[in-house]
Structure formats: C-alpha cells, structure tokens
Amino acid sequence: MGNTDKLMNQIFDLKFTSKSLQRQSRKCEKEEKAEKLKVKKAIEKGNMDGARIYAENAIRKRSEQMNYLRLASRLDAVVARLDTQAKMTTITKSMTNIVKSLESSLATGNLQKMSETMDSFEKQFVNMEVQAEFMENAMAGSTSLSTPEGEVNSLMQQVADDYGLEVSVGLPQPAGHAIPTKTEEKVDEDDLSRRLAELKARG
C-alpha cells in the first residue's frame, strides 16, 4: 500500500495546486475588470494616455488569467489520469486475491464458494471496464484551454465597444470584425429599397 498511498498524496497535492491556480485566475479576472473601469474613468477625464495604459493592463491581466486557467486545466487532466491509475492498482490487487480464492474453491470442489468468488470476479471486471472508459474520456477531454488567435485584439475591441475607444485611443480592430458604421448601414438600407422598387416595377 506504500506506493498507492504515495500516489494518493501526490494526487492531493496536485488538486490543491490546481485550486490555487483557479483562485489566481479569478483574481486576475477581477483585476482586469478594475482596469477596464479605470479606462472608463480616464476617458471621462479626457486622459487618453492614461486610458491606453489601463487598457494595456487589462489585456495583460486577461492573458495572465488565461495562463492560470490553462495550467489548472492541464493539472486537472493529469490528476484524472493519476486517480484512475490509483483505482486500477487497487482493483488489480483485488483481482489477485479473487484468483487465489477461485483456485482454492476449485481445489476443494466447493461449488457455493466458487459461485460467490465468480460473482466477485465479474464485479471487479465491470469496475475495470468502467475505470478504463473513464480514463479514455479523461484523456479525450484533457486538451488544454488554448487562447484563440486574436484573443488580445478581441479583448481590446471589447474595451473599445464598452467605452468608445476604437477611434480616440487607436485600438486595433480584429480582422473581419470591424463594426459597421451608421453610413454603411444606411447604404445597405438604400440598396435594399432600390432593389425592392425595381422588383415592383417589373411586376
């Protein structure tokens, strides 16, 4: 049981570390929101240089939050695998004892004992199948959270949308996500009206 106990202690330590990383992630999220609020207040005071600095801080906190979250996710995946390994080790030891009991039953010709042993044997096999399936699912779902390309630009655009910074502080807009202007919307409406008029004229 020494190795199993050691493994369980390691699993406990990893779980503790993962929770600590998640707390750090939540802390960074709160700090990010605080920086965004500073951006808003700086704009209200006309302090665009300060607003830019606070916006950069918000982006940095967002990046830190994702890094902590990514590490926590990877640790959780490792813990799931180790936890499965520990359970499989315990089951394997139980199987060894059952095999010995089955051999004893066969040697003595005790049918009742043999039947009881086979019940235990089959139950352990079911447990092993469940654990194996759990491990496969854990491995399939253990891909780390990756920050999508353009994550920073998207967050900067969010700050811009919330506080009207897209022009005043020159924040870049992610490709393909430019906000349509009122003029563009008006042109689209005029074009649609023109096409409808043409269709009516043809009718």
Swiss-Prot record:
<feature type="compositionally biased region" description="Basic and acidic residues">
    <location>
        <begin position="192"/>
        <end position="203"/>
    </location>
</feature>
<feature type="coiled-coil region">
    <location>
        <begin position="13"/>
        <end position="51"/>
    </location>
</feature>
<feature type="region of interest" description="Disordered">
    <location>
        <begin position="172"/>
        <end position="203"/>
    </location>
</feature>
<dbReference type="GO" id="GO:0032509">
    <property type="term" value="P:endosome transport via multivesicular body sorting pathway"/>
</dbReference>
<dbReference type="GO" id="GO:0007034">
    <property type="term" value="P:vacuolar transport"/>
</dbReference>
<dbReference type="InterPro" id="IPR005024">
    <property type="entry name" value="Snf7_fam"/>
</dbReference>
<keyword id="KW-0653">Protein transport</keyword>
<dbReference type="GO" id="GO:0010008">
    <property type="term" value="C:endosome membrane"/>
</dbReference>
<feature type="coiled-coil region">
    <location>
        <begin position="109"/>
        <end position="140"/>
    </location>
</feature>
<dbReference type="GO" id="GO:0000578">
    <property type="term" value="P:embryonic axis specification"/>
</dbReference>
<dbReference type="GO" id="GO:0090351">
    <property type="term" value="P:seedling development"/>
</dbReference>
<keyword id="KW-0472">Membrane</keyword>
<keyword id="KW-0967">Endosome</keyword>
<protein>
    <recommendedName>
        <fullName>ESCRT-related protein CHMP1B</fullName>
    </recommendedName>
</protein>
<comment type="subunit">
    <text>Interacts with CHMP1A and LIP5. Interacts with VPS2.2.</text>
</comment>
<dbReference type="GO" id="GO:0015031">
    <property type="term" value="P:protein transport"/>
</dbReference>
<dbReference type="GO" id="GO:0005739">
    <property type="term" value="C:mitochondrion"/>
</dbReference>
<comment type="similarity">
    <text>Belongs to the SNF7 family.</text>
</comment>
<keyword id="KW-0175">Coiled coil</keyword>
<keyword id="KW-0813">Transport</keyword>
<dbReference type="Pfam" id="PF03357">
    <property type="entry name" value="Snf7"/>
</dbReference>
<comment type="function">
    <text>Involved in ESCRT-dependent multivesicular body (MVB) formation and sorting of endosomal cargo proteins into MVBs. Mediates the MVB sorting of the auxin carriers PIN1, PIN2 and AUX1. Required for embryonic axis establishment and seedling growth. Required for autophagic degradation of plastid proteins. Promotes the efficient sequestration of cargo from plastids into autophagosomes. Mediates the efficient delivery of autophagic plastid bodies to the vacuole, but not into the cytoplasm.</text>
</comment>
<keyword id="KW-0963">Cytoplasm</keyword>
<dbReference type="GO" id="GO:0009793">
    <property type="term" value="P:embryo development ending in seed dormancy"/>
</dbReference>
